[in-house]
Amino acid sequence: ETEKEKEGYTKSVKTLLKDCENNQELKKGVEGVLANLIDVPEELQTAIEMSLGMALQNIVTETEQDAKKLVEYLRKNNIGRASFLPITSIKGKKIENIKGNKTGIIGIAADLVKYNKKCEQIIYNLLGRTVIVDNMDTAIRVAKENGQNFKIVTQEGDIINLSLIHISE
């Protein structure tokens, strides 16, 4: 990863990534930061970024033991905190179907991003119950038609989740 790619990460994530680059044993079992493991179409970047929030900085590891090793390293070196997504333990579920009028629905977020197949359960966990729509009117309609059983995000990044509406800046 270049320094430019690390912009916006918390200090502890930046430090951990840098240390992994210089220490092969530490790096073993580390897939990378979630933001670098998904490919998002340009027109959906705001919606996906809002959907994922801070999870974009989560570090994907092969196993729980790999995550544990990194947690111990963070503590031992007083680096700070980071969140981890072990491939072997994360399970996700994707929405089966969206009821009602499909007009304005762009799709299920997990289907709209590209990723390595081995990260599929992580993507389903984080984006499998999120629907991306074109605008707020569609979001409100879809929420009513589906009983708000999932998160709805507009292309502009506004979020409707259960009875909460979050407007992005």
Where are these regions (language model features)?
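Hinge-like oligomerization/junction regions that interrupt long coiled-coil arms in large cytoskeletal
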Residues: 2-169
